[in-house]
Amino acid sequence: MTRTPLIICDFDGTVTMNDNIVSMMKEFAPPEWLELKDGVLSKSISIQEGVGRMFGLLPSSLKEELTGFILKDAKIRDGFLDFVSFVRSNGLPFYIVSGGMDFFVHPLLEGIVEKERIFCNHASFDNEHIHIDWPHACDGDCTNQCGCCKPSVIRKLSDQQKFLIMIGDSVTDVEAAKLSDMCFARDYLLTECKELGLRHLPFQDFHEVKTGIENIGEVQAWLQKKNAGANLPR
């Protein structure tokens, strides 16, 4: 059976060069955010709790400043635009699943990735301090309080007929990487993939990811079958 590739891609630190939440906190948050960040990285507090409390340190009145800062500070990783063209032209199912917030994820991806292919958290600026809503929280099979739960999103999008490809970099990507058939990893996630013995390839830019995906046997088989079907006489 030829399985259909399904590509799930992180955003912060993967599509972008830096982690946008960390950049934002360094610029605007009081020192208390550092303890929360360390708690998330050490897994002593959940991602949902840590990130929610970090944003709770910021007054909602900063919305315009925060948005302007990220749109100016964030840099898209080399090769991403070509990579999106590659998956689109080949009909490869591709989704962004991000622990980031809609107020910066959507503007940064506008004109590149359709909104219906983006899963992320929602930041509310209605109260004195920023409040985070979690529209893609953990399902009944996950108790990790992930925030935007990548395994739960994957379970909605995937099944046994899918060949799951994960692209990521951080602690928020580890559980999704465990579900993947192939993981493209960098930074923290690369170390975790090595320690857990997961099938993976390192990457620094999306040119490497594109080449790596093109060389996966399962992807080649699916593309051959798809193209053969497209060339059948009607």
UniProtKB/Swiss-Prot annotation:
InterPro entries from the UniProt entry: HAD-like_hydrolase_phosphatase, HAD-like_sf, HAD-SF_hydro_IB_MtnX, HAD_hydro_PyrdxlP_Pase-like, HAD_sf
Gene: mtnX
Family indicated by similarity: Belongs to the HAD-like hydrolase superfamily. MtnX family.
E.C. designation(s): 3.1.3.87
Record's function text: Dephosphorylates 2-hydroxy-3-keto-5-methylthiopentenyl-1-phosphate (HK-MTPenyl-1-P) yielding 1,2-dihydroxy-3-keto-5-methylthiopentene (DHK-MTPene).
Pathway noted in the entry: Amino-acid biosynthesis; L-methionine biosynthesis via salvage pathway; L-methionine from S-methyl-5-thio-alpha-D-ribose 1-phosphate: step 4/6
Transferase recorded as keyword: no
Keywords: Amino-acid biosynthesis, Hydrolase, Methionine biosynthesis
Protein name (Swiss-Prot/TrEMBL): 2-hydroxy-3-keto-5-methylthiopentenyl-1-phosphate phosphatase
GO molecular function: 2-hydroxy-3-keto-5-methylthiopentenyl-1-phosphate phosphatase activity
Any Gene Ontology biological process: L-methionine salvage from methylthioadenosine
Source organism phylogeny: Bacteria, Bacillati, Bacillota, Bacilli, Bacillales
